[in-house]
Amino acid sequence: MSDIFQEVDDEVRREQLKRLWERYGVFLIAACVLLVVAVGGWRTYEWWDAKKAAEAGTAFQAAVALSTEGKNKEAEEAFATLAASGTSSYRMLAKFREAAEVARRDPKAAVAIYDQLAADSSLGRVLQDLAALRAGMILVDTAPYSDIVQRLEPLTAPDRTFRHSARSMLALAAWRAKDATAMRKWSDMILADGETPSGTRGQIQMLLALADADKKS
């Protein structure tokens, strides 16, 4: 008797499945097709994205080679092209390198590029600080001390990545401006920071020695 009931149950299930298929089968097929298309489209995008990244990497290395060979004009043009059309990560790297090449012939124009990068919040604070530091390094020999302070003092806070370099540049700018008080302030800050790199510490000690020699002369 139980076999009869089982056969009836199976027949009912088959009939239900048949009705469901007749009603919704076309939608199931469409969903499967869309899934296949979506997966295929994603795979195509991944392939295309990897291809573009590889091309940008090759172009970046070629531009670096031009710079190494002293072909600065060609390197500048290559970095500018990549900064305009490369993948997002290489665009940023290329923009920094473009500014470095521009600085060889036109420091003012290079500062403008670095200022643009420093103002771009999409880069994140570390890269923004790096751009601001690079601009300050270009200007340290020519700009008034007050301008260097305005640019670099925010970078000297204990939580900033490039604080040691920023403090060093400010100490140098103060020395050039013959502002002994400011130079001592930044020098003391550098020497008191236990995380100051030994190279930076040595440079400041040399700067202090030069300042002492200036006093005696």
List PLM regions with ranges.
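N-terminal positive-inside, membrane-proximal cytosolic segments immediately preceding the first
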Residues: 1-34, 55
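Amphipathic alpha-helices of TPR/Sel1-like and other helical repeat/solenoid scaffolds
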Residues: 16, 74-82, 114-117, 151-152
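Short, low-structural-confidence N-terminal segments
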Residues: 26, 32, 36-46, 216
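Transmembrane signal-anchor/signal-peptide helices with a preference for the extracytoplasmic
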Residues: 38-60
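Flexible helix-coil transition and linker loops at the boundaries of alpha-helical arrays
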Residues: 47-48, 83-85, 119-122
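Short extracytoplasmic
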Residues: 58-93
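Soluble extracytoplasmic domains of inner/organellar membrane proteins
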Residues: 89-217
